[in-house]
Amino acid sequence: MSIKQWPEGERPREKLLERGAAALSDAELLAILLRVGTRGMSAVDLARYLLQEFGSLGRLMSAEVGKLSAYKGMGTASFTQFAVVREIGRRILEEELQEEITLSDPDTVADYLRFHLGQEKVEVSVALLLNRQNQLIAVRELSRGTVAENTIYIREIVKLALDEYADSLIIAHNHPGGSPEPSQEDIMFTRRLAQAMSLVDVSLLDHFIVTSQTVRSFRQLGLMP
């Protein structure tokens, strides 16, 4: 049965208009984005199938075009739509951070970092540069690559902070393997960086480790120098 044949109150679009987007399931939201299904499958059926195959909405939305294209009804058009949705979400979160980012609101920072780094397939490190009021000046990528390739030079971070006239910064990196626990190398690097930043009167406020499901804060773990 096609969605057009469903009772009006159960159709995703009509349900959204009547109850709001929060009332829809992941499959219903995805069905609105997909618009159509395939032969024998409504858009909602296709959405449910894809969510089951990929394991989560985040993994599906971050899938590469080649992997998406292996599924009937999916391809470059769907990949483009998903990429646009991800980027819009990232920019909205970045706008919120630029308006006000404070340590009293760590959830906003964690949400942004999870969205920005959580689905990366390789290790990526970023710096969030802040002014005296703890408002976001800029987000800069520090490195990208495998763990073996992902070398971050402290002097480059110091230079970046000075070039951007930052009063403080937050650094973050993802663990593609899924474990959010800081390694001994992470802890030692954070100590060395905090010491180097103090020499130029820039505060290292926190270091976050990000996975697709979890964000860990060094400050909350009691690991900040």
Curated annotation (Swiss-Prot):
CDD domains: MPN_DUF2466. The keyword Plastid does not apply. GO terms for molecular function: metal ion binding; metallopeptidase activity. It comes from the Bacteria. A motif (JAMM motif) lies at residues 173-186. GO terms for biological process: proteolysis. Keywords: Hydrolase, Metal-binding, Metalloprotease, Protease, Zinc. Zn(2+) binds at residues 173, 175, 186. Pfam families: RadC (PF04002), UPF0758_N (PF20582). Residues 102-224 form the MPN domain. Belongs to the UPF0758 family. This is UPF0758 protein NGO_0681. It comes from Neisseria gonorrhoeae (strain ATCC 700825 / FA 1090). The lineage of its organism: Bacteria, Pseudomonadati, Pseudomonadota, Betaproteobacteria, Neisseriales.
